[in-house]
Amino acid sequence: MYRKIFDMVNGSEEQSKITDWLYKLMIEDENSLYKIDIKVSKRRISEQGDIYREEGEYIENADLQTLPIGTKSFVQNGCWKGEIVSNEKKHLYMPQIGEMREIKVGSTGLNIEIE
C-alpha cells in the first residue's frame, strides 16, 4: 500500500491530522506495508560549533512498516518525534537512513531527521 502524506501543513488543525494519521498507522494491521516519500536531513555541527542541517537524499517509497505499534508521537519544539522501542521487529529504524530521531512537517511533506 502506498500513501502520500500532506505536502504542507500549516496550523494546529492540520498538525492534528498528522497525529491522527500516525495513530491510525500504528493501530492498523502490522503486516501491511506503509510507504511514504520522505526527505532526510542530517544534523551537523560546524567548526564554530553551530548546529545546522544538511539536506539528504530524497527517498521515495521508504518503508514505514517498522513504525512500532504504541509509538508515542508528540510535538516538541515544532518537531514530530517518536519513541524508540526495543522490539526489533517493530523498531523505529529504516535500513536506508537509520533511526528516526525527528519527524518534521516541511514543504516537501514529512522530513525525517537522523543523527
From Swiss-Prot:
Protein species of origin: Bacillus subtilis (strain 168)
Protein name: SPbeta prophage-derived uncharacterized protein YoqS
